[in-house]
């Protein structure tokens, strides 16, 4: 099945500490034919300054098509900022590309974005959630992001993940816990509405 990557962007993108950020790493190992980039206002400003994200993608995969969603979101730490726009954006991609599998980057963006996208990946047909741990296997907090003044071409030249034999860090986490709680809540709602037969059918 053909693939499309839906990816928010964060401080680890496109490269951090001489290794791929999550977006680039998924692109490298899953080779989707198209990438849909979701920008907050902060990431949009960085892209407009030097096109760091799109340049890095074109450098790694010259034939990969790029779509961009500029959300204008400033308060990226608020769930309500993403609760509507992210599901709508993913659904739009699914509707426009019914023959494609949608890969969802669960490792870039704010914790709020990651949670919303993980729930979507768990509960949406033809969607696959992918995580990319840091190369050290630890939190990225101690590794400062590259300065905005550093040319992305220089970062790409010293990218360890571009070397032959570099480790594939992509993981497909079990998201059944999200699906379990969603189904549980549906069953409870049906019981409260006295729809016992429907609740029993769903439980089975």
Model regions: which residues?
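Long, low-complexity, Lys/Arg-enriched
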Residues: 1-103, 112-204
């Amino acid at each position: 099945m053909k693939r499309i990557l839906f990816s928010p962007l964060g401080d680890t993108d496109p490269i951090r500490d001489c290794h791929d950020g999550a977006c680039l790493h998924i692109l490298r190992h899953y080779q989707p034919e198209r990438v849909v980039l979701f920008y907050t206002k902060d990431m949009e400003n960085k892209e407009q300054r030097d096109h760091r994200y799109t340049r890095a993608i074109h450098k790694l995969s010259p034939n990969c098509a790029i779509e961009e969603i500029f959300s204008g979101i400033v308060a990226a730490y608020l769930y309500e900022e993403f609760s509507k726009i992210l599901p709508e954006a993913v659904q739009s991609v699914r509707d426009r590309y019914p023959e494609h599998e949608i890969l969802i980057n669960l490792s870039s963006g704010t914790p709020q974005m990651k949670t919303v996208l993980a729930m979507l990946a768990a509960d949406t047909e033809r969607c696959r959630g992918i995580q990319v741990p840091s190369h050290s296997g630890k939190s990225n907090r101690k590794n400062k992001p590259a300065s905005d003044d550093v040319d992305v071409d220089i970062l790409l030249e010293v990218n360890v993940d571009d070397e032959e034999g570099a480790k594939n860090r992509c993981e497909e986490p079990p998201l059944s816990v999200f699906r379990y709680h969603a189904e549980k809540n549906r069953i409870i709602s049906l019981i409260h509405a006295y729809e016992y037969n429907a609740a029993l059918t769903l439980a089975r």
